[in-house]
Amino acid sequence: MGKKIWLFAALWFISVGCSSEGEIYMTEVNNLWGKNDAKKIEFEIKDSQSPKNLIFVVRNNNEYPYNNLFLISTIKGEKNKVLKTDTLQYILAKPNGEWYGSGIGDVKEILVQYKNEYKFPANGKYKVELKHGMRTDQLKGIEDIGIKIENIKTTTP
């Protein structure tokens, strides 16, 4: 039975990572995230003419002490040129403490919208840097954080 669960989990992660709707890029936080520790996620845009939906992927466990998460997000282009900086708040749990998202065991994964129909200025390599904006210096309970980049399907009349 245990082998079936691991096989299912492995296939699920592969299918999510290879989704035709978008690509997911993750970085590890390892349950302790320092206030000044910028998590860097690098990716390449090959079709800048097509707008993209940018979605953050947050994986937290039961040690996470809050129901919300403040993120400071910076998109950087070639030569580390800052294209966009935002301060964002996401709700991770219901008022009763139940986590939003899905997952097996103590770890929950939630996808939260960042940018709709974002147009990158050119093809090339980009980076998203994420810092937490919570009041604590060492934030517990975040396992991984990442970004999903979805190509927007356009229909022609």
Report the location of each language-model feature.
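Internal, hydrophobic beta-strand segments that form the core of beta-sheet-rich folds
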Residues: 121-136, 141-151
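Short acidic/polar inter-strand loop motif in beta-rich domains
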Residues: 61-63, 108-119, 132-140
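Post-signal peptide N-terminal segment of mature Sec-exported envelope proteins
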Residues: 26-47
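Short coil-to-beta strand junction motifs in C2/discoidin
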Residues: 65-71, 141-144
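Post-signal-peptide N-terminal segment of Sec-exported extracytoplasmic proteins
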Residues: 40-68
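C-terminal motif of bacterial Sec signal peptides marking the signal peptidase cleavage site
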Residues: 14-17
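An anionic, turn-rich surface loop/hairpin at beta-sheet edges
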Residues: 88-119
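Bacterial signal peptide processing site
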Residues: 19-22
